[in-house]
Amino acid sequence: MILKTFQNHSILGAIFFGIFVAPSFSDEKETKSKANSDVKKAFIDGTGQGWRELTGEDFVNVNCDPKTWTWDGGHASCTGNPVGVIRMKKPTKNFELVCEWMHKKHAGNSGIFAWASPASIEKLTAGKGRLPDGIEVQVLDLGYETNWEKNKGEPSDWFTSHGDVFPTGPAKMKPFPPVAPNGKRSFPTKRLTRGINEWNHYYIRAINGEVRLWVNGEEVSGGTNCEPAEGYLCLESEGSPIEFKNIRLRILP
């Protein structure tokens, strides 16, 4: 009789636990699952249909020295001097780009221009200025941010080392949040950049005036309503050595 009573109470307790307690575990699991699903992950290596590797044959020197950029197949090495860019031979509009990059010096600075305006490229070719107008995807070493904080005694509120996207010169863009105080830069939602002498992976998607950036497999920043929304894809030399490899492009309609 005692055993039966105990069994009945155990059964009732199990039912109560299942009805009232189990959902809390279920809700917690669903909440975590939803949070994870909100992060847009896409570690794309550029080997599917329509992708092709970019080499030195695809680029034209705009205003760098002849020895600033050297190529070994699809592996590019840049000295960083002088400040300037190389551009693809033809302008692009809608595309996807993947690449890996690695800074070779503490606080290194570089960038990828998704759409550099042809007019600004012409000026650079004529010796007027160093960098083009357009939409830039920042390629910055962690040390750049560290040096700023050390010298200024406070964190930077106008840039990060984790994949800012922003317009340069007269170019325009509506940045995705979080947005820099000046209202122009899209700051990354996560800090995923790896440090000096480590490879980082970028996936850039530029379609119909919208640019999105994935850093090491996760989407972090971007913007829409870009002007220009067509132009030259450029790699930037900006004062320090950097390497790019596995640069692959897919042109979209």
Annotate each language-model stretch with its function.
Residues 2-12:
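Bacterial N-terminal signal peptides that target proteins for export
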Residues 23-25:
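Sec/Tat signal peptide C-region and signal peptidase I cleavage site
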